[in-house]
């Protein structure tokens, strides 16, 4: 027992190119001196897929499979669920129990948007699978970095696309619409990701101060 209160679980969601990784790193650097965290608590950076050793192997299968081995939509959904179950059980829950804070680049919202809205798999089935994979764990706060698809495509430029990114603009448009719907249904906090990175970072910091009850300095 650490004597610390339960940690916080914060998630960044959004389409590719929205700046999730950049903003997660910025927030992780700011949090220890923000006044939000109790003394002695640490920040854990993570991501999905790939937040565990097993998850890294699953990430390779999902995003860069060998020729001829790409999973079908249902298999894709199950692989993401396996990644999340391992992530929750071996990384997130232990860290929270120790009083630490966990920042994750994607969580269950991405599955609902990509495999539900994007692939067209039944949302009720996805929700039940998520309940099993997470054991009912939900984020304390989800920041949705809202970026139009055209801006996402421009930012990605000529960078090689992974298998999900290469699924086509119509697919990615459905994913973006899914994120917008989920943000309303799940009461995520929207951040305008078309702004400069430092403006986005300040918006994220402001939301955390507002939601966690600490006034801006």
Q: What are the roles of these predicted feature ranges?
A:
Residues 2-4, 28-30, 150-217:
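NTP-dependent small-molecule kinase module
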Residues 5-9:
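Pre-Walker A (Motif I) flank of P-loop NTPase domains
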Residues 12:
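Hydrophobic anchor at the beta1->P-loop junction of P-loop NTPases
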Residues 15:
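P-loop (Walker A) phosphate-binding loop of NTP-binding proteins
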Residues 20:
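Conserved lysine of the Walker
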Residues 23:
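Hydrophobic positions on the alpha1 helix immediately C-terminal to the Walker A/P-loop
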Residues 38-134:
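ATP-dependent small-molecule kinase phosphotransfer cores
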Residues 106, 110-177:
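A glycine- and Lys/Arg-enriched "phosphate-lid" helix/loop adjacent to the NTP-binding pocket
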């Amino acid at each position: 027992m650490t004597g610390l209160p339960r940690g916080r679980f914060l998630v960044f969601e959004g389409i590719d190119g929205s700046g999730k990784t950049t903003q997660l790193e910025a927030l992780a650097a700011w949090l220890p001196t923000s006044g939000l965290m109790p003394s002695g608590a640490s920040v854990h950076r993570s991501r999905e897929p790939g937040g565990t050793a097993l998850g890294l192997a699953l990430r390779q299968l999902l995003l860069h499979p060998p020729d001829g081995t790409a999973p079908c939509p249902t298999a894709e959904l199950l692989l993401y669920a396996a990644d999340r179950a391992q992530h929750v059980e071996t990384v997130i829950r232990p860290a929270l129990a120790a009083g630490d804070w966990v920042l994750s680049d994607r969580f269950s919202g991405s599955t609902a948007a990509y495999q539900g809205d994007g692939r067209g798999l039944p949302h009720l089935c996805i929700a039940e699978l998520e309940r099993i994979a997470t054991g009912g764990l939900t984020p304390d706060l989800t920041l949705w970095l809202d970026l139009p698809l055209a801006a996402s495509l421009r930012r990605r430029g000529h960078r090689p696309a992974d298998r999900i990114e290469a699924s086509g603009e119509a697919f990615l448009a459905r994913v973006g619409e899914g994120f917008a719907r989920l943000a309303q249904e799940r009461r995520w906090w929207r951040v305008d990701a078309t702004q400069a990175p430092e403006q986005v970072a300040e918006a994220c910091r402001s939301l955390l101060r507002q939601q966690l009850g600490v006034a801006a300095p």
